[in-house]
Design a protein with these regions (language model features):
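Extended alpha-helical targeting/anchoring segments
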Residues: 1-197
Length: 197
């Protein structure tokens, strides 16, 4: 069972984000909130049942705390001296009539996707050369326990400098957090999100 967040609290947070967008401090923000989930599964059970492309289960032995995460998005891939990112932005239920045409024709979804692709391209430029958008706004089909959804993705790549292997931590630090889960511009939007949450 998922317990709904307090609507009044969420409305205040939304108003903080919205007023910053109206003032031009951000033009895309992902506002989230904590919710309580009552479940008879352990974190390990959830991890093993998750259908995400990427799943992680972290256990802190000192505090006995656990964290589980699953995501369909490939944030960063490094292969043969190249770095790739595959931002996802734009989703629709695949069972809806003409779902593909609706999603690909949606101006709001297209604008959000363009914003995040530009942000990730910019982030990759901090750590790589010859950054390019290799594939723009293609469809992925994601299979969930409630049915398929369509998601738009892009592929962005760049060439890492010689010796990058010694600096993987710095590369990830320059890229994190992923713009597709924060918003744009990233630093200011993160300040706004922190203020609202």
């Amino acid at each position: 069972k998922v317990f709904e967040p307090n609507f009044e609290d969420y409305t205040k947070r939304f108003e903080t984000v919205n007023s910053n967008i109206l003032r031009g401090n951000s033009y895309l923000a992902n506002l989230t909130c904590k919710v309580t989930v009552d479940c008879n599964l352990t974190f390990e059970d959830i991890f093993l049942r998750a259908k995400g492309k990427y799943n992680i289960l972290l256990k802190d032995k000192n505090s006995n705390r656990q964290f589980v995460c699953f995501s369909p998005e490939t944030f960063v891939k490094i292969k043969n001296g190249m770095i790739y990112s595959y931002p996802m932005k734009g989703t629709i239920d695949a069972s809806l009539p003409e779902a593909e045409q609706v999603l690909m024709g949606d101006k709001k979804e297209a604008a959000e996707h363009a914003t995040i692709v530009d942000l990730i391209r910019n982030d990759l430029s901090r750590v790589a050369e010859h950054v390019s958008v290799d594939k723009y706004r293609y469809l992925d089909v994601l299979h969930t326990n409630k049915g398929d959804i369509l998601q738009t993705s892009s592929e962005i790549s760049g060439k890492l400098p010689t010796g990058y292997q010694k600096h993987i931590g710095n590369i990830l630090d320059a890229m994190l957090p992923a713009g597709s889960i924060t918003g744009a511009p990233k630093d200011k939007t993160m300040e706004i999100i922190n203020e609202s949450e």
